[in-house]
Amino acid sequence: MAVPKRRVSHTRAAKRRTHYKLTLPMPVKDADGTWRMPHHMNMTTGEYKTTKA
């Protein structure tokens, strides 16, 4: 089993953690002007990929 030889310093751990970030969801605008999440159904019209769901 892999065990660290030395303790990881606070600075080194913080530098590694800088890459742990969340991305904001990017909604898309439909043809009727409403906003929805990509690959999701439009909740106002009930359509998904131009077909009624």
Curated annotation (Swiss-Prot):
The keyword Ribosomal protein applies. GO terms for cellular component: large ribosomal subunit. The keyword Ribonucleoprotein applies. Residues 1-53 are annotated as: Disordered. Signal peptide: none annotated. It holds the Pfam family Ribosomal_L32p. HAMAP family: Ribosomal_bL32. This is Large ribosomal subunit protein bL32. The gene is rpmF.
